[in-house]
């Protein structure tokens, strides 16, 4: 017996084609939504990581050393020479900072100058930068800072372990080193936020003497 051939209905064929196209389009849309979700989730994770890292890296750190402070002799912006031995018997607070171009660093020193508590406590603050006089003096004049800055070629900053503590590997960060009258390091603090209220700084320093 001969097999009867089924004729394809054009309407059915068109409906099948439309259903296939619709299914294909839905699959593409679902894939796009999935990719979008993955991208958004990735961005959220990256941003959250950056925020956590930023908060973590901006935390102040401090330590009590207790060792003999490295000796040094440096030229100043005033054209004089300063040595650690000049302050034997007196507490000294070294202020290492990024120097020229760092407005927050210069503002910090301006704030310290305005606080009479340091002088009243007999504490001498020596700001140290890796600049020449020509580089740093305009900043000091701009912020009205009168204290002479000590000009370091990096030797002293390295000796005190302050290099790379800020945004630049080859420069000091924003840190302080307290040396007592016997030449002993009593405290070291680093502040990546580039600012420490002078009143809090004074209180912290006095608590370590």
Regions found by a protein language model. Give the residues of each.
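N-terminal intrinsically disordered, acidic low-complexity segments at the extreme N-terminus
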Residues: 1-19
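Juxtamembrane low-complexity tails/linkers enriched in Ser/Thr-Pro and polybasic
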Residues: 18-30
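N-terminal "domain-start" segment that seeds a small globular fold
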Residues: 32, 37, 53-84
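Hydrophobic membrane-insertion alpha-helices, especially the h-region
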Residues: 38-53
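Short active-site neighborhood of thiol/selenol oxidoreductases, capturing the structured segment around
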Residues: 82-106, 111
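Structural microenvironment flanking redox-active thiols in thiol-disulfide oxidoreductases
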Residues: 106-145, 154-158
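Structural micro-motif
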Residues: 145-147, 163-177
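Thiol-/selenol-based redox modules, centered on thioredoxin-like
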Residues: 171-209
């Amino acid at each position: 017996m001969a097999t009867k051939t089924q004729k394809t209905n054009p309407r059915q064929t068109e409906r099948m084609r439309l259903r296939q196209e619709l299914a294909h389009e839905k699959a593409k849309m679902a894939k796009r939504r999935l990719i979008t979700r993955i991208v958004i989730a990735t961005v959220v994770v990256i941003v959250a990581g950056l925020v956590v890292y930023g908060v973590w890296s901006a935390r102040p750190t401090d330590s009590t050393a207790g060792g003999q402070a490295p000796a040094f002799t440096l030229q100043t912006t005033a054209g004089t020479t300063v040595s650690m031995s000049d302050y034997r018997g007196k507490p000294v607070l070294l202020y290492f900072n990024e120097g020229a171009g760092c407005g927050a660093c210069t503002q910090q020193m301006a704030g310290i100058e305005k606080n009479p508590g340091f002088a009243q406590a007999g504490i001498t603050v020596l700001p140290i930068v890796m600049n020449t006089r020509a580089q740093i003096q305009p900043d000091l004049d701009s912020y009205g800072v009168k204290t002479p800055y000590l000009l370091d070629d990096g030797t002293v900053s390295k000796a005190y372990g302050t290099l790379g503590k800020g945004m630049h590997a080859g420069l000091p960060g924003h840190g302080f080193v307290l040396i007592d009258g016997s030449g002993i390091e009593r405290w070291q603090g680093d502040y990546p936020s580039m600012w420490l209220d002078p009143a809090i700084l004074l209180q912290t320093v006095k608590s370590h003497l």
